[in-house]
């Protein structure tokens, strides 16, 4: 497996891998990483579909990429913010047929939609019960805070192992709009991994200027289950891939001899019946280890979601622990799943039932939410919320079967253990109705109307996810297994807890990248895997981000010590009349 960039590799079709007709594949899980692996086995690996078996413990595919209507109402556990430089994602989705537009791909639909209706937030944050917080596109960070960010950007990864963000930043960063934007957009907490924070900065340096108003982002038409998962599953079924639902993989055994590692068997359980499936070197095994939505609990309008981080037999954490016990190269799951109080947050899906609540939404987002176009344009953060509440409406309808007079709102709170500002209870102890009341309070609904609207004008379903931020926990090298560990001959790890270079977790791209790299490595496919977009090596992006992070202030306006000011003045003299001076002026750096 090797990385590439450019159209030469991107548009090429690889030759059929040697011996692939004699191979089969077992894929544990049906999340985005697993489905991506299956799609690449079919498209580029040219494996027969009936040789591919997707094993899923739940009754539906998709993993964390969900969006369903239950008896209790619509539920979206999360949402996906996407980037034009998700290179693997677009490499695959260009080949997945649309379910709605004949002759078009999922990428075509997505591209046309975001061209016609580009994303932009008109109100990034509120305070004082629905008043615009007037962040006004500003990062509001001091020169000292900017230097802390720059220092992290250039700190070697080796020095950031097991470090927290609080080990690097202080209140110069934490009190800024920058941190409010960052932590709520990506769900970072102050105690999370400084290494991952650095990777994010480098990965999305080209989008720094688009963070305050979300012009950097793109979204799907519907929820991600309907817009991404269903087309992928349909593509796979059309190629004969087998899906086994409500089937747990409770154990994987490995034969490890010298430097060679082979997955030798998997134990599956279906309807209480357990079976051991032996594996040969020609049986490829793809393992989704860990899981950000494991142990999640769903509430209802009149029921709290609760908080139960118990790791149950057959879930992703339990399986990874059994696997990790067999070899040090298989990672250290305890680094991620041992402190659920530090890795949880709670979300809720609020469905409006009449025209009473939408007027308050419209006042804040400054758009009509019923047009089918962009509404909030990303999350609206309630700056003075004790839960640090954020909420969003993507294009409506979010579900194909959603009534046209209803809206589906996604709400989440980073601090599920704190009492609310109106409902004096921790979010995790609140029913859907109570979470809706807290949200309505922060929308600016008159207090005398809040209970009535939460009761009769909305249906709210909360979801508690104890491990949703587990991948952000401080880590060291080796805590996540390599996608294909050294010496592995027939297995690979997939998803957010598998290790690949430079990319960032909690993204669709990371999951899909692990799936592509796993297949390309095990089948030795002779085509390049698209490298992570290289904006971190592009001096144009670096200078542009530096200026925009400082709200347009020039380098010459920095609060520098006397000696550094003199040095800068001398440098500017040296470059006078050169292309370098012209370049810096073009990007408003001087």
Please state what every model-predicted region is.
Residues 206-220, 282-284, 289-514, 520-534:
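C-terminal segments that line or cap access tunnels to active or ligand-binding sites in enzymes
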Residues 88-95, 181, 227-238, 434-442, ...:
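Amphipathic alpha-helical segments that form well-ordered structural scaffolds
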Residues 103-111, 245, 527-537:
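Short, glycine/acidic-rich hinge or "gate" loops at secondary-structure transitions
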Residues 13, 19-148:
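N-terminal glycine-rich phosphate/pyrophosphate-binding loop and immediately adjacent elements
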Residues 1-3, 37, 41, 45-84, ...:
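Beta1-alpha1 glycine-rich phosphate/pyrophosphate-binding loop at the start
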Residues 99-206, 217-219:
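Rossmann-like flavin
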Residues 202-284, 289-290, 302-303, 308-317:
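Helical element adjacent to the flavin cofactor pocket in flavoenzyme catalytic cores
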Residues 1-25, 43-51, 69, 545, ...:
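Extreme N-terminal leader/targeting segments of oxidoreductases
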């Amino acid at each position: 497996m090797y990385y590439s960039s450019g159209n030469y590799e991107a548009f090429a079709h690889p030759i059929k891998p040697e011996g692939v007709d004699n191979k089969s594949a077992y894929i544990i899980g049906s999340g985005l990483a697993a489905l991506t692996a299956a799609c690449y086995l079919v498209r580029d690996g040219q494996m027969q579909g009936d040789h591919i078996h997707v094993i899923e413990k739940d009754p539906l595919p998709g993993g964390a990429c969900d969006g369903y209507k239950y008896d209790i109402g619509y539920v979206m556990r999360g949402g996906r913010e996407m980037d034009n430089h998700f290179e693997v994602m677009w490499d695959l989705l260009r080949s997945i047929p649309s379910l709605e537009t004949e002759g078009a791909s999922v990428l075509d639909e997505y591209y046309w939609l975001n061209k016609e209706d580009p994303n932009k937030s008109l109100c990034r944050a509120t305070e004082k019960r629905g008043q615009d917080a007037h962040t006004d596109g500003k990062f509001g960070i001091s020169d000292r805070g900017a230097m802390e960010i720059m220092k992290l950007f250039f700190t070697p990864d080796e020095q950031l192992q097991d470090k927290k963000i609080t080990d690097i930043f202080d209140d110069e960063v934490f009190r800024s709009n920058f941190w409010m934007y960052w932590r709520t957009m990506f769900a970072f907490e102050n105690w999370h991994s400084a290494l991952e924070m650095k990777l994010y900065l480098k990965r999305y340096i080209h989008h720094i200027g688009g963070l305050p108003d979300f012009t950097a982002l793109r979204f799907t038409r519907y929820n991600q289950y309907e817009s991404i998962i269903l087309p992928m599953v349909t593509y796979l079924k059309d190629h004969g891939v087998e899906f086994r639902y409500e089937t747990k993989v409770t154990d994987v055994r490995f034969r490890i001899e010298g430097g060679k590692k082979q997955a030798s068997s998997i134990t599956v359980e279906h309807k209480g019946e357990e079976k051991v499936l032996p594996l040969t070197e020609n049986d490829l095994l793809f393992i989704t280890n860990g899981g950000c939505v494991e142990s999640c609990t769903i509430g209802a309008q009149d029921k709290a979601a609760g908080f139960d981080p118990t790791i149950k037999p057959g879930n992703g954490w339990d399986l990874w622990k059994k696997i990790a016990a067999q070899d040090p190269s298989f990672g250290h799951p305890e680094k991620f799943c041992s402190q659920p109080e530090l890795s949880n947050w709670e979300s809720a899906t609020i469905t409006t039932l009449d025209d009473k609540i939408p007027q308050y939404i419209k006042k804040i987002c400054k758009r009509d939410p019923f047009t089918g176009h962009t509404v909030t344009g990303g999350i609206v953060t309630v700056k003075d919320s004790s839960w640090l509440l954020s909420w969003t409406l993507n294009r409506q309808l979010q579900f194909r079967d959603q009534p046209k007079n209803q809206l589906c709102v996604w709400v989440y709170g980073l601090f599920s253990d704190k009492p609310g500002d109106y409902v004096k209870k921790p979010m995790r102890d609140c029913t859907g109705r109570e979470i809706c009341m807290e949200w309505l309070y922060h929308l600016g609904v008159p207090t005398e109307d809040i209970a009535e609207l939460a009761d009769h004008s909305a249906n709210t379903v909360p979801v508690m996810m104890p491990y949703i931020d587990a991948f952000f926990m401080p880590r060291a090298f080796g805590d996540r297994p390599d996608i294909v560990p050294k010496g592995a001959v027939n297995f690979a790890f997939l998803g957010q807890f598998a290790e690949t270079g430079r990319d960032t977790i909690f993204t669709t791209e990371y999951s899909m990248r692990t799936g592509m790299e796993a297949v390309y490595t095990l089948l030795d496919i002779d085509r390049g895997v698209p490298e992570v977009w290289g904006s971190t090596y592009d001096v144009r992006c670096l200078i542009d981000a530096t200026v925009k992070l400082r709200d347009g202030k020039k380098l010459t306006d920095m609060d520098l010590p006397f000696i550094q000011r003199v040095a800068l003045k001398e440098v500017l003299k040296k470059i006078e009349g050169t292309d370098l001076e012209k370049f810096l002026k073009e990007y408003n750096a001087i």
